[in-house]
Amino acid sequence: MWTHALSYAPAADFRFFLPAMRRLRTGPWLSWHRGATAQDVRRVVKRVRDDGPLTIRDITDDVLVDKDWLWASRKPSKLALEVAVTWGLLTVSERAGMLKTYELTDRHFGWPQPPRPATARQELAYRLDRALRAQGVVSLPSVCFHAPKLKPAVRELIEQRVRRRQLVPVDVAGVEHWATPDTLDSIPPAPDPAVVHLLSPFDPLIIQRERLERLFGYKHVFEAYVPKPKRRYGYFALPVLAGDRIVAAADLKTDRAAGKVLIQQWTPVADIVDRPAVDAALACFERFQLAAVT
C-alpha cells in the first residue's frame, strides 16, 4: 500500500499497511534502503525505545558521510530511521517543517491491542475502495499506482463488482474506467472557472501523471532534480486549476524578509477566463505562506 510521504493517512487504516510493512522486513530490501543495515535499524529503534522520541538533530554521534542525492542527510542514522518507519517499527509522531520526530509505533498510538494485519483480500478491496473515494472514476493503472503486479487481481475484483452492479464501466478517451452508480448519478455541474486552486505537484490530482494528462490534457513535470537550463516550468512549479482546466504552472518563491511571494516563472498552458480570480488565488496563497506560525 502506498501514500506519498507528505500525505496524511487515517490511523484507522493502519492495518491495511501492515502486510506490506512486514513483507519489507523479511523480503528483499528496497533499492533506496540498501545504504542501511539491519543492525543500523535495530540500533536506532533501541535508541528511541530507551531515550524516547527523537529527531535526527538529537543524534550527534554519527560519523558523517557524503550525500548521495540532493535532499539526503549526511548522518547514516537518518536512513536507518526512515527504514524503521517503512517497516512499521517507528512512526513520525510530529513534524516541524521538514524535521520529523520519530517514536515507537506501538507507544505512539497506544493501542490496547495492536491492529491485526489485513488479509490479502481485504487489502485489495481497500485499495479499490480508496481509489474510488479519491478519484471518483478509476482505471486499472490508477488503482494499481506503484503496484502494477496487482492489476490481474484488481481486474477480477472490479469485474465481480460489475456483475453485482456495484460498479459501472465508463469510457474515458478510449480507456476503460469504472465508477459507482452513485457517483454517476450525482455528477455536479461544470466547475466555475472563478474557483481557482494552486496545487502541489504532490497533490493526488497531479501525482498520477498519466491520469492527469488524460483528464486535463496537461502533462506536469516535477523539475527540482532537473538542471536549471533544462527546466520547462521551474524548480517547484504549482499547477493552477481554474474550474475544470489547468491554465498555468507557477514557480513561486517566498521572500519572508520582503513579505512577498515572488513569481519566479509563470508558464501559461491554457487561456485564463477569469484573471481576477487567479490573482485572488495568488493573493490568498501569499497570505497563507506568510502567516505567522504559532
Regions found by a protein language model. Give the residues of each.
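Long, charged, low-complexity, helical-prone intrinsically disordered regions
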Residues: M1-T294
